[in-house]
């Protein structure tokens, strides 16, 4: 069980086979939840959310409860001893005596990595500033696998705040590891993908990247559209946010020329960037995406705790050309 006892701070820590193991197991957990209802019985998840969260925090809690475990922690930093001046190191040293596995969200990039250095139990990064969000990446991957089939040779468009969007940064890096991927990066000029990240994936994985400020221009060629909100909390100047907040709004009319097997994703929460009329389009999978986040986090925690062995289940998935059997072999 190679994942047992490990921390997950950055998706780069996962091998390609480990990513497949987690996706595999998460899909099987969705199909056969009763089989896993006691897999974490007696285990405690400790949650440390120094920044607001709905989906990530609650999906972690739901994931542990569905496996028979329990949860303790805080979601409001004002109720923790950090407000009294306690250091991250001391907080971690205490909490890892109370819990078997920890998840941390923090507004400062790098803090979960720092926390992992003081913890004797696995630490999962639940999002750190504008840096990384590895479990959202796993959520995105399992959703693509479930609704589009094999992750290979896809044209993926990221649209919105690409500068501060940690979900974009994590997913772009990870998808670049899959075969024959192409990316379209759509953003206002003020919010481009970080140059060092773009350079890294091009040099390391030889992927093709197109940068543009037009969503409409590329709609017909996209396989996966990953919409993101313009993040108000990352702006120091309210006027700058107001200027950019409605840069992109996905509507039914924009989707008229899109592929019929397009998948529309969004890490949520959304503001105005996807009109509610799109929710009824069968290509909109962002609510299903949030649901799949529970199962992939179940899989991750079970593997990090060493409470489960991978049997590499064979799963039947519906894809665009009918029904196929997809099999992954875990290492």
Swiss-Prot record:
**UniProt keyword Ligase present:** no
Give the pathway listed in the UniProt entry for this protein.
Pyrimidine metabolism; UMP biosynthesis via de novo pathway; (S)-dihydroorotate from bicarbonate: step 2/3
The enzyme's main class, written as a single word, is transferase
Annotated Pfam families: OTCace (PF00185), OTCace_N (PF02729)
Q: Which residues bind L-aspartate?
A: 84, 166, 229
- Biological processes per GO annotation: 'de novo' pyrimidine nucleobase biosynthetic process; 'de novo' UMP biosynthetic process; amino acid metabolic process
User: What UniProt keywords are attached to this protein's entry?
Assistant: Pyrimidine biosynthesis, Transferase
Does this UniProt record's set of keywords contain Transferase?
yes
EC number(s) per entry:
2.1.3.2
- Show the catalytic activity: carbamoyl phosphate + L-aspartate = N-carbamoyl-L-aspartate + phosphate + H(+)
* Classification via InterPro entries: Asp/Orn_carbamoyltranf_P-bd, Asp/Orn_carbamoylTrfase, Asp/Orn_carbamoylTrfase_sf, Asp_carbamoyltransf, Asp_carbamoyltransf_Asp/Orn-bd
Residues annotated as binding carbamoyl phosphate = 55-56, 105, 133, 136, 268-269
GO molecular-function terms, A-Z: amino acid binding; aspartate carbamoyltransferase activity
Signal peptide residues are none
What HAMAP family does this protein's entry cite?
A: Asp_carb_tr
Describe its partners and assembly state. Heterododecamer (2C3:3R2) of six catalytic PyrB chains organized as two trimers (C3), and six regulatory PyrI chains organized as three dimers (R2).
Q: What does this protein do?
A: Catalyzes the condensation of carbamoyl phosphate and aspartate to form carbamoyl aspartate and inorganic phosphate, the committed step in the de novo pyrimidine nucleotide biosynthesis pathway.
User: Which family is this protein grouped under?
Assistant: Belongs to the aspartate/ornithine carbamoyltransferase superfamily. ATCase family.
Q: What is this protein called?
A: Aspartate carbamoyltransferase catalytic subunit
Q: Which gene encodes it?
A: pyrB
